[in-house]
Amino acid sequence: MSKILSIIIPTYNAEKFLNKGLSSFLVCRDTDAQTAQHNCKMATEGRFEEIDIDKAILDKLEVIVVNDGTSDRSVEVAQKFVDWYPDTFVIVNKTNGGHGSAINTGVEHVRGKYLKVVDADDWVDTLALKHLVEYLEHVDSDAVIQSFRYYDISKDEYRPADVSVPDFTGEYNLKDIVNMWDDVYDGLSFHGVIYNTGFYKALGYKLTEHVFYEDQEYATVPFSYAKTVRFIQEELYVYRVGDVNQSVSAASQVKRLPDLEQVIFNVLEAEKSFAKMPQGGKEHFIRKTSGIITSYYQIALIKNTDRQSGRAIVEQFNMKLAQKSALMYEAVQRKYKVFRLFNKLHVSNSFYENQFAKLLELAKRVGRADRLYRK
């Protein structure tokens, strides 16, 4: 049976999370929330024989666990799935090279028509996965964008990150996406994107290795070359947040600013290929890259508790940015001035994210409602 979807799982010291993630790929004939919990429990206890697998779907799915030099029992956890479902689960071992390196290696091994990356500490909605495999079997677009949801472990709360398009049965280009930006932006991310394997491999693009934040690169540069894109409303990916040990925590982000800077300048190399991008590709690239640079400003100027140091870091960054890309430097100046003002006023990151950012989101929703009303 040919594979329809390949899931790449970059894995490094994820022993305590991996079982939940891998068990979420066990599509059963009766797939609901209760079944998913049962599957996770059975897998934890090694009682795979009690899981009522939908073989027709599992035969079309490939799950590649890329062992990025892990030092814990992650491989042992994954091996149990390989032993029971050798036609679906596979382990690829490599020396440690970071998240981007693990994705690059995973791409070399995919056999599916489409590929998606799911982090080892996250999981998927199993019923949505079943629907996705069935859907991908009948489309050929360069990329698919799917709604996802956040799970905040500190609050035990889910929050949707949904996309909205006029017709979920239709196919869109990047110019369309730019025109629908606020309605689809949440899905234009690492957690929302699914690539056609043939399209992705033909680009020959390699993600930055030995750094954090290359997920921004993954969702930006290859996607800027997509000629055809489809959207799925049902939420698939469950993105776990709220863990102070995660790389997305404020302290970790400040510490890893040099990584983000390296990724930004690697992304900017794609400017040399604007002529190869399809209609709307350049505009998409500018908007997405502006967002990445804006996140750099937020981390350095707002999340960094040493405000003076943050200003000095950004001044050096802006000098390099102006030299590298006058286009992107001009594109982000208004946002930079806002963040610099917030820095001077000692606006906290919690205020920015809980108050100011919410006002911006409300404005977007009002605009979205107005557009729907005018139709």
Task: Identify what each model region corresponds to.
Residues S24, T31, N67-E76, G98:
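A conserved acidic beta->alpha catalytic loop
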Residues T35-M42, F48, I53-K55, K60-T70, ...:
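Short beta-strand/loop segment that forms part of the nucleotide-sugar
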Residues H99, I103, A120-R230, Y237-K255:
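Donor-binding/catalytic cores of nucleotide-activated saccharide
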Residues A14-D52:
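Short, well-formed alpha-helical segments that are part of the catalytic scaffolds
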Residues L115:
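Short aromatic/hydrophobic "clamp" motif used to bind/position activated sugar donors
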Residues S141, I302-K375:
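Membrane-interface aromatic/basic loop that binds lipid-linked glycans or pyrophosphate carriers
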Residues K3-S6, E62, E217:
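Cell-envelope/extracellular polymer assembly enzymes that use nucleotide-activated donors
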Residues K94-V110:
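Glycine-rich, basic loop-to-helix element that forms the pyrophosphate-binding segment
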